[in-house]
Amino acid sequence: MTQAEEPRLERVVVLEGGISSEREVSLLSGRGVKEALASKALEVESWDPAVDSVGGLEEGAYDAAFIALHGTLGEDGSVQGLLNCIGLPYTGPGVTASAIAMDKELTKNIWRANGISVPAGVRLTAAASDAELERAIAEFGADGVVVKPGHDGSSIGVTKLDRDALSLHSLRAALNAAAERDAAEVLVEEYIHGREFTVAILDGKALPVIEICAPEGSYDFQNKYYTDVVRYECPAKLPEASAKALAAACEKAFAVLGCRGWSRVDALERADGTFALLEINTSPGMTPHSLVPMAARAVGLSYADLCLRVLGLARTDIA
């Protein structure tokens, strides 16, 4: 795969910005996508749901929409439903798959039911009792826990507590921090102290596996987007059989959720060499630090051609 087939599109709208905590990242992604598509002689405009009216989408006479929104509205099925109603083809998964993927616990349950390994954990709220927290520590805290919002992305609101730092007090503080991002649902999961990987899926097929080598395992929001301290290995230095197994698991994870177009799946390696899948990103970042473009480059696909490939897969849920 070295060349992107240019879709027969002339007028495209890039959806960017939005109202989520990932707004600034979305604007960075949108800027890159707009420049790339314009370089391919497409007429490109932008639409920001935080400031622009729905009428602008309806009246734009666009051939397709490239969704560069992240988080609420952009990845939860909301904007996908709107675009279905308008009849405007869009990039990425449809309404149902997007809504499911936004819910980390529901996603894990579906994956687990389909034989895909995921971290053990429990879903709580900020109102969880001390007894519930103590039970979570007893059941999942042998090596520490990871506390995260049930629906947010970009590692926002995530706290990692290793075994020495884990206590009722520290878990309560982490729970409250995550609940500030997602009052409805917080996940407390086992802390898997292993290598971190991500796999981009394009049209149902995995691109080369990327290993994320963050300082002290801290692949947080700041390190993801605003520093150069994280090192990446692409393709990851894994035995061939392990890389194939991880890629196959991620392709299956994409398929069983009913995804289409593109996505990115995050995973951790367990001590026994197997992998636990963490979550799926249905509108992956396209910033200068983003990982899908990195994986695409490894197979000879430029940023601009990647944008065209993704755009060429634009669909609606309505036949």
Where do the protein language model's features map onto the residues?
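Phosphate-binding site of ATP-dependent enzymes
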Residues: 168-248, 269-276
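Short, flexible, mixed-charge acidic loops at enzyme active sites
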Residues: 78-85, 218-226, 282
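ATP-binding N-terminal substructure of ATP-dependent carboxylate-amine bond-forming enzymes
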Residues: 1-109, 113, 124-135, 312-319
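Active-site nucleotide/adenylate-binding loops and adjacent lid/helix of ATP-dependent enzymes
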Residues: 2-16, 44, 100-187, 193-194
